[in-house]
């Protein structure tokens, strides 16, 4: 996860710097986080909120923090699912149970869709930026998938196998 304040610090007009965080797949997902720093002016936020609306998105203004809102809240969802797999619960069972509980897809199908490399990098970044809390420690299973090149749909294999 990028720190918008770090980018803004190098900009000649940091008050005109903010972020827009779209969700994958961006053509389908309606949510966009509009990320403000401590120096972002209100006009910049208004422009980005309107841009989000013009793009057919639902903009939510949030503070510049590790993972912003969605990625920070999603970390425990992924990490606890990975911990269950480490404890021997079958991945298809975890996905099926969470899909039956109302999630659009289970966590492993979602990680494969997003890309295991991206998801693992975000997990590591949020973990480090928040001071390495044990509850957010990235999973060894996910680290292995990335090391093996099993990045999900984009590589043809991840937690599941896909036809390219």
Residue positions per predicted region:
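N-terminal glycine-rich phosphate-binding loop for ADP-containing cofactors
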Residues: 1-164
